[in-house]
Amino acid sequence: MTSPTAPVRRPALSPSRAGDFKQCPLLYRFRAIDRLPEPPSTAQLRGSVVHAALEQLYALPATDRVPETALSLVTPAWDAVVAEKPELAEEIAPELRETLLKEARALLSGYYRLEDPTRFDPQSCEQRVEVELSDGTLLRGFVDRIDVAPTGELRVVDYKTGKAPPEARALAEFKAMFQMKFYAVALLRLRGVVPARLRLLYLADSQVLDYSPDLAELERFEKTLMAIWHAIQKSGETGDFRPNPSKLCSWCTHQDLCPAFGGTPPPYPGWPENFGAA
C-alpha cells in the first residue's frame, strides 16, 4: 500500500522573492529553494505584531476601532505571532519582548495620525491573491488591505513599520512601489480593474505615499514580472544562481555559504516541484 502524496503546489512568484532574485540570484536560491533558516530580525517581529493588531482591529465594528482598542490588541497580536512560530517564545528575552510591544504600540498610535479607521470598512485585510498570467507565470502574495469605494474604485494599502536609514530610503521606497505594482497587476488580472490608488502608510515616519497607476504602466510591469519568472526558471533548470555582491551583502545572513565571501553553497537540490511561493 502506497502512502498518499502531498498535493503539488505550483511554484509561484511573490513580491519578496522577485525582489530577492533582482537583488541577488543566489539569495533567491537560498531562500526559495534551499529554504535556509534565517533568524527573524526585531524589525520583522515588530512589523508582524503591528500587522496582526491592525488585522484584528479591522475585524471589529467601525465604532470600536478607537486608539485605546488598537493598543489593547498588541499583546493578543504578539500571542498570534508566537502561535505561528512557537520557537520565538524561547528565543526572545522578556526585556526584548517588552521593548518590541512598546514600539508596536507607538507605531499603532502613529497610524491614527494617518487614517481614521472608524470612518470606513475595508473590503479585506491580509488578502491572499493568486493569479496566472497569460504566459503561465503564477503570481502569489498577501495584500495588507483592499478598500473599495461605493463607485467601485480599488485602493490597495500597505503598512510599512520600518524606518530605513537615509542612505537606504530611496531603495526601500523603490522596493515598496515594486511590491505595490505587483499587487496591482494581480488585482487587474483577477478583477479586470486597474486599482485607482496604491497607498503606502509609513507608520514610523507618519507619512502617506499615494500613487495612481494606469493600464499601460501595469501592462509594462506585467511583462517585467514575466521576464523575472522566466529568468528564475532558466536558473532553476541549471542551478546557476550567481551571487551579485553589493552594499546589501552587509545584512545577509548567508555570507559563510556565498562564493563572493569565500564560502561554498550546499549542493543544489534541483528545481522543486511542490514548494510554496517562490
Feature names for model-found ranges:
Residues 53-125, 132:
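A non-catalytic, helix-rich entry segment at domain boundaries
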Residues 20-28, 48-49, 66-87, 193-203:
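Short, compositionally biased low-complexity segments
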Residues 12, 68, 151, 184-278:
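Metal-dependent nuclease catalytic regions and adjoining charged, substrate-binding loops involved
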Residues 127-225:
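Mg2+/Mn2+-dependent nuclease catalytic core
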Residues 18-19, 23-62, 101, 105-109, ...:
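Nuclease catalytic cores
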Residues 26-34, 51-54, 83-84, 158-163, ...:
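Short acidic (Asp/Glu) and glycine-rich catalytic loops that position anionic groups and cofactors
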Residues 1-7, 13-26, 129, 143, ...:
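Anion-coordinating catalytic cores for phosphoryl-, nucleotidyl-, and glycosidic chemistry
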Residues 8-10, 25-38, 85-87, 162-166, ...:
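Short amphipathic alpha-helical segments and their helix-coil junctions
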